[in-house]
Amino acid sequence: DVLQVIRKIQCTTAAAPVAGIVDWLYTPGRSIVSHEGGSMETITGDGVDPYEIRLHLMKLGEIALYGFSGELYSALGRRVKELSPLEHIILINHDASLMARSGYIFDDETWARDTSNRLPGHRSSRMLPGYVLASLEKHTLEMFQKIGS
């Protein structure tokens, strides 16, 4: 992905304006409790910490570097690229993993297909399906607007 984007970039200026922003995305979360015998219980609602993703957006001229504190699944990455007002956007996973426990950032379709909980990170994910896409769209648009794109 990075190589495909880099190959398309033409440097036409000696200096480029730089802007950046950091934001946090919060959605309802879930807790997974293991019981004796191997059974697992999912807890949601009051008393459960929200699921959080730390977002970093940096604009270098007409290039955007957009970082996430977890690993963004492809469908979400494609949607972010569609929303970008810049032609060249590079998505960076795990850029602040120690600051937020985002883990794998699943899209709802992938989550729904994994009924057997075999995807890496699915069982332990604190993400509650149904919230990330809309919040990611909102934050992405707001962040690009704030940095002047």
Language-model regions, residue ranges each:
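Non-catalytic substrate/cofactor recognition surfaces at enzyme active-site rims
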Residues: 1-149
